[in-house]
Curated annotation (Swiss-Prot):
Compartments where located: Cell inner membrane
Main subcellular location: membrane
Function: Part of a membrane-bound complex that couples electron transfer with translocation of ions across the membrane. Required to maintain the reduced state of SoxR.
InterPro entries per the UniProt record, alphabetical: NqrB/RnfD (IPR004338), RnfD_bac (IPR011303)
Cofactor(s) annotated in UniProt: FMN
Residue list for modification FMN phosphoryl threonine: T187
Membrane-spanning ranges: 20-40, 42-62, 69-91, 123-143, 215-235, 242-262, 267-287, 301-321, 322-342
Protein name: Ion-translocating oxidoreductase complex subunit D
Amino acid sequence: MVFRIASSPYTHNQRQTSRIMLLVLIAALPGIAAQTWFFGWGTLFQIVLAAITALVAEAIVLRLRKQSVASHLQDYSALLTGLLLAVSIPPLAPWWIVVLGTGFAIIIAKQLYGGLGQNPFNPAMIGYVVLLISFPVQMTSWLPPYEIAATTPDILDTLRMIFSGHTASGGDMTLLRTGIDGISQATPLDTFKTSLRAGHSVEQIMQYPIYSGALAGVGWQWVNLAWLVGGVFLLWQKAIRWHIPVSFLLTLALCAALGWLFSPATLASPQLHLLSGATMLGAFFILTDPVTASTTNRGRLIFGALAGVLVWLIRSFGGYPDGVAFAVLLANITVPLIDYYTRPRVYGHRKG
């Protein structure tokens, strides 16, 4: 009998990088479907543009670095980076916005550090923050959900808006952002913060069409619940661990509840924080990035809690309506320190 001698490892599992990334892409389908339903075809077009840009940028850099292009592209990490950025920007943002942001995320935030596994910051969030700071108007021009929109563009008009900035009838972003009440709409978090600064009371703000009959804004609560469904799928498949999303959501809810309890006239309610903006997307798809998050169980709990506090602080007192991207990057900075102080004790070690 002939025995084949193989090198280690002698045990194998299915947790390959490509499989985990593919599971995350599959888990994103409910969120993508919900955003497309409420905000139109632009979400899908932005994803296509981001995916093409991510693959091309990754291939170019890999070729320049004389590395295998095919093997690296097959891990789906570039596709996931493009997807996360695409669903974070307004559906009708100009085409160059997503191309520029995705290119920056892949080339600068990922490959410049050495590629997958070497980057200290989440590439998609780096790209998003660069776009938000550089092009605030384009990055905050969200359409109202179709239920309260005065005008809803079809597929062709969506393409025209992305590539030319106008519909076939000459309509522009200002017209499309107008709600059924004739007022230009924004996201629930943006509307809440802007209206408070304008001197409106919370009771008045909650009467706006974007909040009518909804816990956290028309359409947005369902989008967040869809991302939550995808997150539960990832937990079920053991593609992510529970520590980060649970600690993040509990901390955000606790901070929001305490703030709302002591200052209900100036701070948003817990349900608005939990079911609006990028809360569930951040909790299950962004913060859980295995490269840039903490690697110990205690560290993951601290990392998630820190991000939750930062999101609440930025939303409540900062200059931006949604602080998920900034919170993720600030939490990424602390990961080496968190991991250092939460390292498990070496087996057999006894404290002196």
